[in-house]
Amino acid sequence: MNIKNFFEKYNIKINNEKLFNEALTHNSYANEHKLKYSYQRLEFLGDAILQMYVSRFLFFNYSKLSEGELTRLRASTVREETLFRVAKDINLGALVKLGHGEYITKGYEKPSILADVFEALTAAIYLDQKEDGLVTWLGQTLFKYIKDSNFINDTKDFKSELQELLQSEKRSDLKYIIEKEDFFANENKILYTVSVNLNGQKFGVGKGFSKQEAEQNAASDCLSKLKKPTSN
């Protein structure tokens, strides 16, 4: 797929194509072709840029949310799962440059790679197009996804909800325990398996590529079991 044609759909006319090529180059491709660059540095910058512009977007568009709710919503917006979904929706995988081995294993469909590329492209667009171009890009991709989907309602703090439920029932001794850590060398990621224990008894299990995500999923699992009607 032609890079310039792809971005013209988003009213972005590329000035420095080298920046965009760098943002789309996975380190496996860089190693095979002996390149001195990959998307990692731009990914670093893109992560910081997203934090800033997502914060601003949420602040001005969701005036009724508290500081804590905005913080949780921002974390959910910039997490890997959300960026992956957006990248997949716009077929970003078709542009990513991968090494042979990574391509064979369908790296162009991997959540970690697509999320990283979205961050790197965000940085490239900011450097090439300045703020106006970046706002145009985010408005048609990430922010559009947030507005059009049920994202806000689906974004919940299950740990806080569980804590409040237990307090209302005067139950205590809540613990989150890491049961397992699986390391994925090809993605340089750790998949955590966490359990929720109440008074020494396991009530829920969750997985995630961060401890926080795994704990949230475990809390969600626990809540679904605690709220399930008991048969008489």
UniProtKB/Swiss-Prot annotation:
Group of enzyme by EC: hydrolase
CDD domains: DSRM_RNAse_III_family (cd10845), RIBOc (cd00593)
Primary location: cytoplasm
A Gene Ontology BP annotation from the UniProt entry: tRNA processing
Any one GO MF annotation of this record: rRNA binding
Domain DRBM: 157-228
EC numbers for this chain: 3.1.26.3
Keywords: Cytoplasm, Endonuclease, Hydrolase, Magnesium, Metal-binding, mRNA processing, Nuclease, RNA-binding, rRNA processing, rRNA-binding, tRNA processing
Gene3D superfamilies: 3.30.160.20, Ribonuclease III domain
One Pfam family of this chain: Ribonucleas_3_3
Signal sequence region: none
Compartments where located: Cytoplasm
Cofactors required: Mg(2+)
Binding site for Mg(2+): E43, D116, E119
Substrates-to-products reaction catalysed: Endonucleolytic cleavage to 5'-phosphomonoester
One GO CC annotation: cytoplasm
Subunit structure as annotated in this protein's UniProt entry: Homodimer.
Name this polypeptide is given: Ribonuclease 3
Organism name: Mycoplasma mycoides subsp. mycoides SC (strain CCUG 32753 / NCTC 10114 / PG1)
Lineage: Bacteria, Bacillati, Mycoplasmatota, Mollicutes, Mycoplasmataceae
